[in-house]
């Protein structure tokens, strides 16, 4: 009788789904309250004026306005703030 040996098992073939992190609204863009500005792990970007931070460190707009990115302080922190639209 003809026989075929069992094939070996592979130990590869796994990969995690991408998390789609990064800046979602860029400097100078007009945003509405609630818009997500940055998705991140940890605080690469810190919240400034009119910006909130979620429990997963997501930054979001608290008011309608224009997005501004700045570097502040001796620690050279990247800060995102919203400049409210002139009424």
Curated annotation (Swiss-Prot):
A cellular component annotation (GO) from this entry: cytosolic large ribosomal subunit
InterPro entries named among the record's database cross-references: Ribosomal_bL27 (IPR001684), Ribosomal_bL27_CS (IPR018261)
GO BP annotation list: translation
Any one GO MF annotation of this record: structural constituent of ribosome
Entry keyword annotation includes Ribonucleoprotein: yes
Protein known as: Large ribosomal subunit protein bL27
Gene3D superfamilies referenced in this protein's UniProt entry, alphabetically: 2.40.50.100
Native source organism of the sequence: Thiobacillus denitrificans (strain ATCC 25259 / T1)
Family: Belongs to the bacterial ribosomal protein bL27 family.
Superkingdom to which the source organism belongs: Bacteria
Entries under Pfam families matching the protein: Ribosomal_L27 (PF01016)
Keyword annotations: Ribonucleoprotein, Ribosomal protein
Residues of the signal peptide: none
Region (Disordered): 1-20
